[in-house]
Amino acid sequence: MTILKWALLFFVISVVAGILGFTGISAASADIARILFYIFLVIFLVLLILGLTIFRV
């Protein structure tokens, strides 16, 4: 992906985040993001532990 495509992608993400942040659904989005953060944190830690122990090559 070229740098211009990356810049366009991050621009779109920032516009969507700005729209969600300046409307009333920001609290709901924050709750969903918090839940997803903890889910992916647990998945990361489990895979990290498995990678360091069981699946060592």
UniProtKB/Swiss-Prot annotation:
Family: Belongs to the UPF0391 family.
Top-level taxon in the UniProt lineage: Bacteria
Lyase as UniProt keyword: no
Membrane topology label: Multi-pass membrane protein
This protein's record includes keyword Lipid biosynthesis: no
Cell compartment(s), UniProt: Cell membrane
Pfam families named in the record: DUF1328
Coarse class of the protein's main subcellular location: membrane
The entry's keywords: Cell membrane, Membrane, Transmembrane, Transmembrane helix
An annotated GO cellular component: plasma membrane
InterPro entries (alphabetical): DUF1328
Residues spanning the membrane: 6-26, 35-55
Protein name: UPF0391 membrane protein BBta_5399
